[in-house]
From Swiss-Prot:
Taxonomy, superkingdom: Bacteria
Alphabetical UniProt keywords: Cell inner membrane, Cell membrane, Membrane
Amino acid composition bias (Polar residues), ranges on this chain: 72-84
TM stretches of this protein: none
Gene Ontology cellular-component terms listed: plasma membrane
Gene source species: Leptospira borgpetersenii serovar Hardjo-bovis (strain JB197)
Family from the record: Belongs to the UPF0161 family.
Protein name: Putative membrane protein insertion efficiency factor
Function: Could be involved in insertion of integral membrane proteins into the membrane.
Amino acid sequence: MNQLVIQLIQLYKKIISPLLPPACRFTPTCSEYTIQAFRECGFFQAIQLSAWRILRCNPLSQGFEDPLPPNTKRTNLTHGRQTK
């Protein structure tokens, strides 16, 4: 499911985004942040992180460097190790 969302975002970046003026106030951009979240997190956590990020990206925000929080990597619950 995560891979499907990533492909949809990449399609948006290739087809729709070039038609719009640059608007993201953050580094990395909201689409790059969302792709990273879906690569490194579970589906529901990635949705939550991405939605919160997009809500913060508005004209009232100054914007700044905003990477994924450090403790967002998927964890294998049976062994406690990080998985990719």
